[in-house]
A protein has these predicted regions:
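An aromatic/glycine/proline-enriched structural segment found at the starts
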Residues: 2-23, 182, 190, 214-215, ...
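Histidine-acidic residue clusters that define the catalytic metal-binding segment
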Residues: 9-38, 137, 177-218, 250-255, ...
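Mature N-terminal segment immediately following signal peptide/propeptide cleavage
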Residues: 28-60
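M16 family metallopeptidases and their MPP-like homologs
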Residues: 49, 54-80, 94-139, 170-195, ...
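His/Glu-based metal-binding/catalytic segments typifying zinc-dependent metallopeptidases
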Residues: 51, 62, 161, 178, ...
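Active-site His/Glu-centered metal-binding helix of metallohydrolases
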Residues: 77-85, 295
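Short, polar/flexible loop-turn hinges at active-site or ligand-entry regions and domain interfaces
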Residues: 87-91, 139-147, 365-366
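Bilobed periplasmic-binding protein-like "clamshell/Venus-flytrap" ligand-binding domains
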Residues: 424-440
Length: 448
């Protein structure tokens, strides 16, 4: 272990696990030495990766709060703060953040999930200090002005109406998610329930920001044209004075084992029947993660995926089949969603789907399917890691969701090492028909 830095920053050095075995990409293994990780005295985790090919920087601030941290009456607050964080501080009034970043040639974005809220900034390296000052300022000193809150409340409520309430697929998915989880807060929609959006109080907002927007609840990623020592000194300059706060309350609830299939029938105006399946899966830190990710590609990853070939191209029982598994701090759901042709019998589709899943659980996958999935995973990985934005995103994912940024450098070999037996074991662990929730949307004709 390396000694603490002179400024009291705890360096986390050492060789990333598995990096030496990346013989197919030795330059990537060597790149691990360019990554530096430190923890400020106030608990802020900082990870920096020097990449000098272009004079730009990508900054990701991962705030460890999502809808899983919300409760009765406060659903949607994590997503709401994604909006509010661009609305000013005493030092930088509303609009300053975007104006100052754009003047330097920079841009920004943000997104919220069930587990995290992530703020992204991209800018020329000459604007590094400005970006850090703006980011630190809004984390510590965000203004909550009642008129601005009400305006953003209307925006978020309209967003919910557009993205969820007016969408048959999104409405069905929201209700399936809520039915699949009896206890765990993954049942809460990220955007929030309508009544909660309309009733948050200023006290709710202040308490939420004070609890979760603290340096010891954030992970800051910097990738690009930066010197690690200079970059860390600037992070300490702008973030270091913000005091740590009490650790947020942990999410202790674990979903009880599902004892039998649950079903939901949703009559809605529309043309196409929809069928959605939700199976209880695993957490991102589970060692079976590579196998389940590859299985996801085999089942629903593209036109050549197994379910698309069988149910769309060959049997023509669906016009589209998709799905996925959102990796989270806790075990989330593996979703499979199908859009059926107008007039299609959903029972006929379900019988065919069950036959395909039975075949998977009995026979597993063949070598060609697994090879295709590995090729896709490798191509996606290297395509992402070749940009500073991809590096920043992946560093954050591994640091926050997988528990250690160094696992990133072992990811290619971890995926390549997956066997057909590993995939079959993951399939049997997840695709248990007794532990699934099925939602069926039956289309209705519009009323006259």
């Amino acid at each position: 272990m390396e000694p603490d830095d002179a400024r009291g920053l705890k360096w986390q050095g050492g060789t990333p696990p598995g990096a030496a075995a990346l013989r197919a990409a030795p330059s990537f293994g060597a790149a691990a030495s360019q990554v530096r990780a430190a923890t400020l005295g106030n608990g802020l985790r900082v990870i920096l990766w020097s990449e000098h090919k272009i004079p730009n920087v990508a900054l990701y601030n991962w705030v460890h709060v999502g809808s899983r941290n919300e409760g009765v009456g406060t659903s949607g607050l994590a997503h709401f703060f994604e909006h509010m964080m661009f609305n000013g501080t005493p030092r930088h009034p509303q609009g300053d953040f975007d104006r100052l970043m754009e003047a330097q040639g920079g841009s920004n974005n943000a997104w919220t999930s069930q587990d995290v809220t992530v703020y992204q900034d991209w800018f020329p390296s000459r604007a590094l200090e400005l970006a850090l000052e703006l980011e630190a300022d809004r984390v510590a000193n965000l203004l909550l002005v009642p008129e601005v809150v009400e305006n953003e409340r209307k925006v978020v409520y309209s967003e919910r109406r557009l993205r969820v309430d007016d969408s048959n697929a999104a409405t069905l998915e929201e209700q399936v998610q809520a039915l699949a989880f009896l206890a765990h807060p993954y049942r809460i929609p990220v955007i929030g329930w309508p009544s909660d959006i309309l009733s948050w109080t200023m006290g709710d907002l202040r308490g939420f920001h004070s609890t979760y927007y603290a340096p010891n609840n954030c992970t800051l990623i910097l990738v690009g044209d930066i010197d690690p020592d200079e970059g860390l000194a600037l992070v300490d300059k702008h973030f270091g004075a913000t005091p740590a706060r009490s650790a947020p309350p942990p999410v202790r609830t674990r979903e009880p084992e599902q004892q039998g299939e649950r079903r939901l029938l949703l009559p809605r105006v529309g043309k196409n029947p929809l069928v959605q399946y939700a199976y209880h899966a695993i957490a991102a830190t589970d060692p079976r993660e590579p196998a389940l990710n590859l299985l996801q590609t085999i089942l629903v990853g593209g036109d050549a995926a197994r379910l698309n070939r069988a149910l769309v191209e060959e049997q023509r029982l669906a016009v589209a089949v998709g799905g996925g598994w959102p990796q989270g701090f806790d075990a989330n759901l593996f979703h499979v969603q199908a859009t059926l042709p107008a007039g299609q019998d959903t029972a006929r589709f379900e019988a065919a789907f069950d036959r395909e899943m039975d075949r998977l659980l009995q026979q597993g996958v063949d070598a060609a399917e697994l090879r295709r999935a590995k090729n896709i995973a490798a191509a996606d990985f290297w395509r992402g890691i070749c940009t500073i934005d991809g590096k920043a995103r992946l560093l954050g994912e591994y640091a926050v969701m997988h528990g250690d940024h160094r696992r990133l450098f072992a990811a290619p070999e971890a995926y390549e090492a997956v066997t057909r037996e590993d995939v079959l074991a993951a399939a049997r662990a997840v695709f248990n028909p007794r532990q699934r929730t099925v939602g069926v949307l039956r289309p209705l004709e519009p009323s006259a």
